[in-house]
Amino acid sequence: MARSTGLAHPVGAAAPDPARVLGPDAVGRRVRDTLEDVFAAVAATRADTAALLTAAGGTGRAPFSADLAALRPGLHGRLAAQDLVSGAGFVAAPGLLADVPAWLEWWQRGPDGTVRPLLLDLDPAHSAYSDYTHWDWYALPRETGQRAVAGPYVDYLCSDEYSLTLSAPVHVGGRFVGVAAADVYLRHFEAAVLPVLLELPVPARLVNARGRVAASTDPGHLAGSLTKGPDFAAVLAAPPGVHRHGDLHLTPCAGTPLVLVTPER
């Protein structure tokens, strides 16, 4: 697994400027603001997909993979408009489509800025990628009915980059039909949130529902590592407020599915 490119509080570093010190709630809101535009893009893909599949169902037939081509103009526009987003699309639940067992209608932005499709062999007879249902970016929205942040992980499926995936479930008529999602390169996410974390007077890390560290200024807890002990999914599902686990303060990031973890001072 690739290592984080993130910064950490260096040993012996000067204390943060008191005039710039933020509290955990303020940092959580800043992190939320960083990711809300990405989640807005995911929500738009979810709405487009639900409308498309509802219309297909109204014709009395099951949808085909070719029907999902109607999502492409919106996906291309979101990739062009969102600097943080490196890839976006819809991942169909197995068995949803009449002509293929699995499908990703997925587009990504290349290094030169061009938008291109992800072409995968999803034939279960000879593809290691045919069952994507166990990956957190798919499983968490399916299990919880809520949006999720998965990773960071090396995205062998799409880019071979260390990435986060933000996703949300898509339902049609009360039935789960797949997830809408967007990828964010970890290096871009860290560039956006590490300056905010560094405004805290203590080392801190952002942790997802599975306990995976998404960004950190704590040299003892690097991005990609697991924080064991707290039930972060329960923290995210609880009413807003600061939670405690031993000497750790756990602050949900204002509606975004990440928890800010800081030590007790």
Explain the meaning of each model-derived region.
Residues 95-96, 173, 204-214, 219:
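Short, glycine-anchored, charge-dense loop/turn motifs used at functional sites
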Residues 28, 39, 43, 64-79, ...:
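Short amphipathic alpha-helical segments
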Residues 84-144, 215-220:
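Extracellular/periplasmic ligand-sensing ectodomains of membrane signal-transduction proteins
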Residues 184-214:
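Solvent-exposed, extracytoplasmic
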Residues 2-66, 161-163:
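Juxtamembrane extracytoplasmic/periplasmic/luminal helical "stalk" adjacent to the first N-terminal
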Residues 133-158, 186-197:
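Short, basic/aromatic recognition patches
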Residues 159-193, 260-265:
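Conserved beta-strands of PAS-like sensory domains
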Residues 221, 228-265:
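Extracellular/periplasmic juxtamembrane segments that couple receptor/chemosensory ectodomains to their
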